[in-house]
From Swiss-Prot:
This is Lysine--tRNA ligase. It comes from Pseudomonas syringae pv. tomato (strain ATCC BAA-871 / DC3000). InterPro entries: Aa-tRNA-synt_II (IPR004364), aa-tRNA-synth_II (IPR006195), aa-tRNA-synth_II/BPL/LPL (IPR045864), Lys-tRNA-ligase_II (IPR002313), Lys-tRNA-ligase_II_N (IPR044136), Lys-tRNA-synth_II_C (IPR018149), NA-bd_OB-fold (IPR012340), NA-bd_OB_tRNA (IPR004365). Belongs to the class-II aminoacyl-tRNA synthetase family. Transmembrane segments: none annotated. The gene is lysS.
Amino acid sequence: MSDQQLDPQALQQEENTLIALRKEKLAAGRAKGQAFPNDFRRDSYCNDLQKQYVDKTKEELAEAAIPVKVAGRIMLNRGSFMVIQDMTGRIQVYVNRKTLPEETLAEVKTWDLGDIIAAEGTLARSGKGDLYVEMTSVRLLTKSLRPLPDKHHGLTDTEQRYRQRYVDLIVNEDVRETFRVRSQVIAHIRSFLMQRDFLEVETPMLQTIPGGAAAKPFETHHNALDLEMFLRIAPELYLKRLVVGGFEKVFEINRNFRNEGVSTRHNPEFTMLEFYQAYADYEDNMDLTEELFRELAQLVLGSTDVPYGDKVFHFGEPFVRLSVFDSILKYNPELTAADLQDVDKARAIAKKAGAKVLGFEGLGKLQVMIFEELVEHKLEQPHFITQYPFEVSPLARRNDDNPNVTDRFELFIGGREIANAYSELNDAEDQAERFQAQVADKDAGDDEAMHYDADFVRALEYGMPPTAGEGIGIDRLVMLLTDSPSIRDVILFPHMRPQA
């Protein structure tokens, strides 16, 4: 590769020249009244034709003379034939000099990669066995003014791929497949829950009290109401209000917003599934989650073995179930139960592990800090980690046998949290006390502690049936199922720092 090819300024100058030439071609089309027509209706998709006629021989296709209308973007132009791409895949279209008018043949020569065309003709098969459309007519629908990335090197700069996802989708089939899978996963989750009598609902994105999770919210102002508001960090408290109101099985798939760090696992705007079912507990949700994950793996991969990087996660086997306390001891045999039950020793262990200890944390909070630093990243195969301390679970029901912990689990796969669930706290007085404790933590410097939500307490005072709820991160789940290393790979338009 020459130095000029590597020089960004030279590359930009070359692109500007190509854009100018394409604009001249568009101007010529406008002068003829042929720019951007919208009167073509296709009757076939490229890949559907490939599948439908895969067994038809060259002779059978010639005899059948099957008429088709296709449309797509030019991805290859060899003069005698072109390859076009639509949402399903690609097909060749043959430029037949015997059947196409001279004027059309002249126009075809001026078309560029990226242009969108409409073609009519009959199906045929080449000597090499490739299916193609022998065109009887073809015309330009959309002129592409910007050239596509170099065909040999493509769009490989990661940041540019995220910033210009539209180009990324045009040139990278694996990226298109990732987002097809994402759509498939969400559709199956919706069907899975509806088949079990769950009702899909929508709850507010703008909230006066950000609740339902320990996170820092985005703040905004409602001008008409002169009211400080927050983009929601979770829909939980509204969904549980609906359970109080009599909708005993509800779910929502929507966006949450958290004004926190960005990493390969975190995006400030992300998609979450939350569902709640009355007359169930967190163990019922574990069973339901295993069933859902197995179905999704089978749907996407045709197997319950999920390859991810150099690992394989086994969804077909029972997920490990282990308490926070026991998991610390299992994965850190140098620690003892006595260490974890002494607040001073636990604080020292948490600090040594790298946790941000502020000094006001109770024993349960310290145990979770130790878990996050010393255990979480070791949980490769699916693990349900249960019995979280009540200090870090202000919305979860206390365990009947040990009131210091709650009937809660988090699901970890590949060292990442994928789901969070619990038997819901439906004791209004206990909920009020826990909100007050959260307010005290916030006053002591915990930015992620929850606000006091008096209306939610009021709702519980009307009575909420025994209920289990769960949140599943859609983005992280899709990462697993598509072997994607970064959350940005599964979000169509991830947030990026503005370019200088």
